[in-house]
Amino acid sequence: MLTDKTIIVSLTSRLFADEITKLQKKIGSILPLQDPHKLQSLDTLGLNAVCSRDVFPDYVHMFSYLSKCTLAILEEVNPDNLILTRLDPSETYQIKNVYEPMFQWDGFSNLTVIPPVFGRQQATVTLESNGFDLVFPSVVPSDLAQAIIGKLLLYNLYSRLVESDPEINIEEVNMYTTNVTHMGRHYVLDINHNNPNEALKSLDDLAVYTCILSALIPRACLRVLTILMRHDQHELLDVFRGIVPREVYEIDANALSIGDDITRMTTFITYLQSLSSIFNLGAKLHLSSYASETQTATCWISYC
């Protein structure tokens, strides 16, 4: 049934029978679109625009793309068009767990839409009839998505270290950065030949924010620890006060006026927020129910 959230993607040629079969197995999955318009062409659908088979994938760029594009559910496959439902906040939708590799969902899962970091080939349905690769994203638990972007940045960081220091063992770098573990299972990330451009820009930002925070943290730490001393404080505060370097306690907290002190604390909090923005994964899907027999979930979307 067509609604005001329906998006119709027109095809340039009729789909072959085997292509229809492959796409029907993907019904209920999430696909990104460049725009929210109701009528669109095939080249706006999926990740092919940022994940071409001819170039090394820039996964950080894809993360950014996914955080800005329109997300929709594949609802219907016809020989001449594809029907999708746009995901809007404050509405509930039905999606299906039809991704490779498949991660277990439950009725309380928070999911994140991420690039096909487990391999472009298994995330792609090639439509020879239209001369187009329809590249699907992966949908994984949000904590796993956080781990993946961390591994991706670390891989690009330590790959540069290997280039400058031949003593560093690349195999050891790969062992720690090119796989993730979830619920006791190991998954290999296809990041050995990724395009590092956007990852390095993110690492530049990380370095800048870390430098600024390193200058602000000692005084901020002292202020927070001393001001929060009280009868009903968190029981772990005493424990963690003991791991703070001695030189922090030697800072003269009264050397600045209260105005300058508050300004520094404001800057500290601002840059903490800026640092976290590097790892912002965009939209999240919150499940309210999941039926493992049909692999169908009811969810709503948020962008915070």
Swiss-Prot record:
Predominant cellular place of this UniProt entry's protein: virion
GO CC annotations, alphabetized: host cell nucleus; viral capsid
Entry keywords, A to Z: Capsid protein, Host nucleus, Virion
InterPro entries according to UniProt: Herpes_capsid_2
Cellular localisation: Virion; Host nucleus
Gene Ontology molecular function, alphabetical: structural molecule activity
The keyword Transport is annotated on this UniProt entry: no
Pfam families: Herpes_V23 (PF01802)
Family that this chain belongs to: Belongs to the herpesviridae TRX2 protein family.
Described function: Structural component of the T=16 icosahedral capsid. The capsid is composed of pentamers and hexamers of major capsid protein/MCP, which are linked together by heterotrimers called triplexes. These triplexes are formed by a single molecule of triplex protein 1/TRX1 and two copies of triplex protein 2/TRX2. Additionally, TRX1 is required for efficient transport of TRX2 to the nucleus, which is the site of capsid assembly.
Oligomer status and interactors: Interacts with TRX1 and major capisd protein/MCP.
Name of the featured protein: Triplex capsid protein 2
Gene: TRX2
